[in-house]
Design a protein with these regions (language model features):
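Transmembrane helix recognition focused on a "late"/terminal membrane span
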Residues: 3, 23, 27-28
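Intrinsic low-complexity, intrinsically disordered segments enriched in polar/basic residues
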Residues: 8-9, 21, 100
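Short, intrinsically disordered, low-complexity terminal/loop segments
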Residues: 1-2, 320
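Bacterial N-terminal signal peptides
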Residues: 12-22
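Gram-negative and organellar
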Residues: 28-320
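Bacterial N-terminal signal peptides that target proteins for export
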Residues: 2-14
């Protein structure tokens, strides 16, 4: 249960969010055609891992501006539960949503900013991204994420992080693309990580939707011991071979990625990793929009090298 003080803080955030939306809506309405529609939606999330940690989330959304699922303004209230054996924790979050992304090119930006309360801890949350072309075959991505560290011990202590970085993608001819990413993750307990990732994508047949991918990621932590509060090796690296497939069916877009790789933690012997992801998006035009994501990964945690994580999430939006 949340305290009266926390509820007051949550309600204050709700009022501020509504005022921000109202002001922004009024300003935009004065400069844009009156054809902008309103909408409402919902969001669900569920995850489970092999250490018995479960996350469940349900959200409702009000959208005073709605063009499609990638172009909207609104607010969201989210209720989450975290459970592990006999332990349980509730979290409440109010967020301002803004998306302005071209579904044909993925150019644009999105922002989810708000406040989350769990246990006796409160935090301002942030999830944002920006993509723009730098040249005909060159793209730039900026991203930032501020969120709780989702383990039993970390939630009890209110540990959170902010992860920000930049990536660049470069097309090489018609069949090849290379991507590089660099980011920094700062934790509220004083720990920090430097992240580096690279990806090479080969498209053998341009109209098939099939891609072959080589992925590499590594991070380095400056604090070796965080007391088992979360998985934190000094050095981690993974190399993964993946196959991706994208198919458009009557406006619906289906994406699937599957891969296998190897990981190394510090100087330990390498072990196997697995990845499977499925994504489904409804047409960008219509009276309602659906977006579904699901996946499974097998990598490492402080419990050992065979940590498994499964998740499923979905968003449904309708015009009013």
């Amino acid at each position: 249960m949340i305290s009266a003080r926390q509820m007051t803080s949550l309600l204050s955030s709700t009022v501020i969010t509504l005022l921000t939306i109202s002001i922004g809506h009024t300003a935009i309405a004065a400069t844009e055609p009156a054809s902008t529609e309103r909408g409402a939606g919902g969001y669900v999330f569920a995850s489970h891992d092999t250490e018995g940690f479960n996350t469940r989330g349900v959200a409702v959304e009000y959208l005073p501006e709605l063009r499609n699922i990638d172009s909207l303004t609104g607010m969201r209230y989210t209720y989450r539960t975290y459970t592990q054996q006999n332990w349980q924790r509730e979290a409440h979050q109010v967020s301002l949503l803004k998306r302005d992304i071209d579904p044909a090119t993925a150019n644009g930006w999105q922002l989810d900013a708000g406040m989350s309360l769990q246990g006796s801890h409160g935090m301002l949350t942030l999830d944002g991204g920006y993509h723009r072309p730098l040249a005909a075959k060159t793209g730039l991505d900026l991203f930032v994420d501020r969120e709780w560290v989702e383990t039993h011990a970390a939630l009890d202590r209110g540990v959170h992080f902010i992860f920000a970085g930049v990536s660049v993608d470069q097309g090489l001819g018609d069949h090849w693309t290379v991507v590089g990413l660099a980011g920094r993750q700062d934790f509220s307990d004083g720990n920090s990580r430097d992240h580096y990732r690279a990806k090479v994508v080969f498209q053998p047949l341009l109209d098939s939707g099939l891609t072959l991918q080589l992925r590499y990621r590594t991070y380095h932590s400056d604090t070796n011991n965080v007391g088992g509060v979360y998985f934190n090796p000094a050095n981690y690296a993974e190399t993964l071979l993946a196959v991706g497939w994208r198919k458009r069916i009557q406006g619906w877009v289906l994406r699937m990625t599957g891969g296998m790789g190897v990981q190394q933690i510090n100087s330990d012997a390498s072990t196997n990793t697995h990845l499977l992801e499925v994504m489904l998006d409804s047409p960008s035009r219509g009276t309602q929009f659906v977006r579904v994501r699901g996946g499974y990964s097998r990598s490492a945690s402080y419990g050992g090298p065979n940590y498994g994580y499964t998740y499923l999430q979905g968003e449904w939006i309708i015009r009013l």
